[in-house]
């Protein structure tokens, strides 16, 4: 008997998942996509399998705006294990070296300021960055080490939350592209004892925070009770990740032309920058950019 093809639902919105430990970001995405029976899905930047916490998942039309969440600042809490370095910079790697930890709380507090602000980081070998088309982590697994260029990142917060040797818990707020594993390794090197990430929890991704995140267990329970449609209650609007942008409401006439790809004028628009655009009813219809001549050019549109 032929297998009946599952008809997926055309739904749109953002679901903020509290990713469980031990699952890749893509595995988490595919699991939630299956629960929602969603036609189109994408995530907004990978979390290591070891990490837990905020992972915004985009469905349907919301996937058009996932890039802007990829570029957003992130927040983390990490447990730094001093005295042990590993091949991967976290607890999943093999131990490279072990040293005695004689670091005190004051030593750690005094080391933190040099890592705040704009700093240079060399990306780890165990990362998804590519060298000549090959992901670095694949080269690392083959025993290769290649030269990586340092990258500029910004650490806006780096605070000590608790100190229980050989572990310390840190709060980190940082720009996109920051590797907390590298931050912890570099900090361990400055302290003279080495260190790795024993645990990592993302507390924020752009405007989304941990309090908004739904656990996989909750999604599975609600799905078991009410099916895919019961999970729609957890979907946020497509522009939820862009609420820090100015909003512009167009007249019915202007919205018609704008949705057909034509730049329009709006007296109340700002003089420059990106905008969330609504039609005359207040419905989000896409994002636009103010051009040099003051018109609002459509950049990404919502399919009605």
From Swiss-Prot:
InterPro entries registered for this protein in UniProt: PsdUridine_synth_cat_dom_sf, PsdUridine_synth_N, PUA-like_sf, PUA_sf, tRNA_psdUridine_synth_TruB, tRNA_sdUridine_synth_fam1_C, TruB_C
Positions of the catalytic residues: 48
Domain of life per record: Bacteria
CDD domains reported for this sequence: PseudoU_synth_EcTruB, PUA_TruB_bacterial
Catalytic activity: uridine(55) in tRNA = pseudouridine(55) in tRNA
Any one GO biological process: tRNA pseudouridine synthesis
Key words, A-Z: Isomerase, tRNA processing
Stored SUPFAM superfamilies: Pseudouridine synthase (SSF55120), PUA domain-like (SSF88697)
Record carries keyword Transmembrane helix: no
Enzyme Commission number(s) of this protein: 5.4.99.25
A GO MF term: RNA binding
Enzyme class (EC, first level): isomerase
Family per similarity comment: Belongs to the pseudouridine synthase TruB family. Type 1 subfamily.
Its job: Responsible for synthesis of pseudouridine from uracil-55 in the psi GC loop of transfer RNAs.
Name under which the protein is recorded: tRNA pseudouridine synthase B
Organism field: Pseudomonas paraeruginosa (strain DSM 24068 / PA7) (Pseudomonas aeruginosa (strain PA7))
Source species taxonomy: Bacteria, Pseudomonadati, Pseudomonadota, Gammaproteobacteria, Pseudomonadales
């Amino acid at each position: 008997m032929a297998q009946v093809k599952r008809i997926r639902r055309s739904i749109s919105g953002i679901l903020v998942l509290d990713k469980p430990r031990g699952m890749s970001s893509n595995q988490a995405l595919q699991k939630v996509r299956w629960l929602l029976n969603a036609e189109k899905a994408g995530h907004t930047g990978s979390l290591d399998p070891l990490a837990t916490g905020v992972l915004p998942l985009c469905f349907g039309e919301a996937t058009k705006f996932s890039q802007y969440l990829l570029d957003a600042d992130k927040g983390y809490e990490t447990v730094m294990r001093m005295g042990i370095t590993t091949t991967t910079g976290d607890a999943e790697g093999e131990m490279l070296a072990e040293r005695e930890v004689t670091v005190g709380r004051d030593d750690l507090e005094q080391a933190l300021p040099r890592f705040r602000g704009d700093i240079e980081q060399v990306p780890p070998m165990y990362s998804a960055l590519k060298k000549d088309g090959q992901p670095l982590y694949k080269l690392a697994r083959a025993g290769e080490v290649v030269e990586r260029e340092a990258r500029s990142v910004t650490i806006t917060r780096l605070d000590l939350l608790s100190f229980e040797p050989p572990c310390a818990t840190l709060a980190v707020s940082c720009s996109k592209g920051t590797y907390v594993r590298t931050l912890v390794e570099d900090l361990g090197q400055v302290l003279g004892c080495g260190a790795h990430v024993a645990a990592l929890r993302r507390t924020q991704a752009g405007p989304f925070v941990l309090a908004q995140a739904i656990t996989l267990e909750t999604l599975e329970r609600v799905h078991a009770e009410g099916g895919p449609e019961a999970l729609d209650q957890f979907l946020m609007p497509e522009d939820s990740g862009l609420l820090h942008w100015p909003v512009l409401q167009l007249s019915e006439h202007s919205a018609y032309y704008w949705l057909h790809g034509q730049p329009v004028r709006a007296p109340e628009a700002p003089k420059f920058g990106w905008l969330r655009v609504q039609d005359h009813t207040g419905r989000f219809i896409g994002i636009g950019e103010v051009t040099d001549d003051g018109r609002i050019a459509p950049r990404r549109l919502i399919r009605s």
